[in-house]
Amino acid sequence: MPPKGKADNSAYRALKKDLTSGTVGSLYVFHGEEAYLRDYYLEQMKKKLLPAGMEEFNLHTLAGRDFEVKKLQELVDCLPMMSQRTMIVVSDYDLFKGDKEGLAQILGDLPDYVCLVFVYDLIPYKADARTKLAGLLKEKGSVVAFHRQEQGDLIDWIARRFRALDKDIGTEDAKYLIFLCGDLMNTLISEIGKIGAYARGTRFTPADIDAVATPQLGAVGFQMTGAIPPGNFDKAASVLGDLFHMQESPIKLLSVLGKQLRQLYSA
């Protein structure tokens, strides 16, 4: 068991090892907040399993709204064409609703050539440990959670993304980017592209980040309340104007500012 409060990344590490060694399994569930990593490893899995140019014949997709056990069985029965494996991606289907018995029969007898991946994107993954299905997933599959990355790993990743643009960013500036824009990689990669296109020098500064990055609401609220204790009311008013320009609802703005002011009061 992972330490209390620490995310269990064992299935994530095992997935990376499987892809490196070429021993991809037959059954996976992908879920979690970090959509960038989920989509990245799904793409790596496709590249590892399916010959280039043959995806049309060996990659099968099924949306949750169209899911039927019969349809899944038909896809499972499709033999590979000029490939060792087929890959089936089922998106946003709640495994623990609907025909659980029929689904359990399929998952319990997957052919070796099939790699079946259930992807949770718009709906949360909530396992029901009491069901036979949960036992099958544990026995025959791998439930991979893509968690938000630790700050150290995220800083290294940000530095690599900037190096790909022939730019450099310091550790403290990378931390500031995370503070301002959040720690989800899809958001950060968009901001990195904007900053890279804007900055003229080879090394980024906080001024480059402030010039073009889109801040998250909480960061702007923190900047505003942080300007009040030293009496920098002009800056506080300027940041308040930025908050209004973000066109968030007044209730949400009050909630964020109230939270920051409570933290300021208790400090």
Where are the language model's segments positioned?
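Conserved beta/loop motifs at nucleotide-recognition and modification sites
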Residues: M1-A267
